[in-house]
């Protein structure tokens, strides 16, 4: 058995928070205690309106992938989070672009899970005011 087959892959967890105003990527170790690299939409585009765009998400994911590979991580588990709460439960436009760009950068994607916060009958939802 060669040495390359015997080496075990190092995994990390990519926490992707994709709202409709911005996209944040934070890569941690498996426990979530140590942050390896993080990036946001504002770090790669100039206009505020472009922070949540798929283009910004792709640029972020490519730069994050380079840093991850330099840190020696080969694979990622992806946790996607939308706005949640009383707001919209679906993730923003940057979520799918982020996952595609990470996979295209040569990282192995393990699990993709949705961790959008869902209220268990929390605060009262806003109603229309009737006159």
Swiss-Prot record:
Keyword set includes Plastid: no
SUPFAM superfamilies reported in the protein's UniProt record: Translational machinery components
Pfam families per UniProt: Ribosomal_S11
GO CC entries: ribonucleoprotein complex; ribosome
Biological process per Gene Ontology, one example term: translation
Quaternary structure (record): Part of the 30S ribosomal subunit.
Entry function: Located on the platform of the 30S subunit.
Name of the protein: Small ribosomal subunit protein uS11
Taxonomic placement: Archaea, Methanobacteriati, Methanobacteriota, Stenosarchaea group, Halobacteria
Gene behind this protein: rps11
């Amino acid at each position: 058995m060669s040495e390359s087959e015997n080496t075990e892959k190092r995994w990390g967890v990519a926490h992707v928070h994709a709202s409709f105003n911005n996209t944040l990527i934070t890569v941690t170790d498996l426990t979530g205690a140590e942050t390896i690299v993080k990036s946001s939409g504002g770090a790669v585009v100039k206009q505020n309106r472009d922070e949540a765009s798929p283009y910004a998400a792709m640029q972020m994911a490519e730069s994050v992938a380079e840093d991850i590979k330099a840190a020696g991580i080969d694979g990622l588990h992806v946790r996607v989070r939308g706005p949640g709460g009383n707001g919209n439960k679906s993730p923003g436009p940057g979520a799918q672009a982020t996952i595609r760009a990470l996979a295209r950068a040569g990282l192995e994607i393990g699990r993709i899970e949705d961790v959008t916060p869902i209220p268990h009958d929390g605060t009262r939802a806003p109603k229309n005011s009737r006159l």
